[in-house]
Amino acid sequence: MARENSTFNSDFILLGIFNHSPTHTFLFFLVLAIFSVAFMGNSVMVLLIYLDTQLHTPMYLLLSQLSLMDLMLICTTVPKMAFNYLSGSKSISMAGCATQIFFYTSLLGSECFLLAVMAYDRYTAICHPLRYTNLMSPKICGLMTAFSWILGSTDGIIDVVATFSFSYCGSREIAHFFCDFPSLLILSCSDTSIFEKILFICCIVMIVFPVAIIIASYARVILAVIHMGSGEGRRKAFTTCSSHLLVVGMYYGAALFMYIRPTSDRSPTQDKMVSVFYTILTPMLNPLIYSLRNKEVTRAFMKILGKGKSGE
């Protein structure tokens, strides 16, 4: 029984990204610092938008959902990586691996669709200001947000079910710092070619389709801004949209590089570096990009901070 299916009878081994050399120890604590900033930044963003009623608009409600997704994303991977590094243990249970794959894939997919919804929100606000309250009513905004979560979760379920239906009869060492389904496919001794084609189609739906919506929305936005008579209105529109476009560029650039490539072209080192970028760095940068360039968020933060000081 050389090819006996050992999928469910032992743990996987996460090789991680750091060893215990002085340089890697420094990098490990740097990642923890970035994680702390990302955790605090996204938590503050969610709380600000929840507490300040003036921020209860479609744009900020969508932004709070993006921050919530980023918060969950970093908590899916970094704590386990830190525990393994500090404890010296590299194992992860089958249930733990499945949980990481589900949440990681679901959150990435949900963010893809949510970024498209955010682009549509900016399009309606700038190109159809008189109809904005109808086109982006609380009900419609809530439905599109829920749709983003559902589509992302569906992809996560598909990946978990498909990945753990394969046989893993050889090495169980995952060349990554968390369970990612492309890394598991490399270890499988089953024929994964059909699933890789399905995975490619899912990536097209999750990445290319939302990108097409974003490009179409911002093409119309740019044309509308160019024809604006007010210089102040043009500046405000570009400031609002540039923050979102910067986040979109960082997120989709890394995602396209990571998941559109064939398995045969993958390098474990490249995958680790890219994963660190959009699972830790991007969630840290998102709240900074939106808050530093947004007077309403800054005002809400100072308002809450002022209440805290006055209550002391």
Swiss-Prot record:
This protein's record includes keyword Transmembrane: yes
Record's keyword terms, sorted: Cell membrane, Disulfide bond, G-protein coupled receptor, Glycoprotein, Membrane, Olfaction, Receptor, Sensory transduction, Transducer, Transmembrane, Transmembrane helix
SUPFAM superfamilies xref list: Family A G protein-coupled receptor-like (SSF81321)
Name of protein: Olfactory receptor 2M3
Compartment(s) where it occurs, according to its Swiss-Prot or TrEMBL record: Cell membrane
Organism: Homo sapiens (Human)
One GO cellular component, as annotated: plasma membrane
Disulfide cross-links: 97-189
Record field: transmembrane: 26-49, 58-79, 101-120, 140-158, 196-219, 237-259, 273-292
Role this protein plays: Odorant receptor.
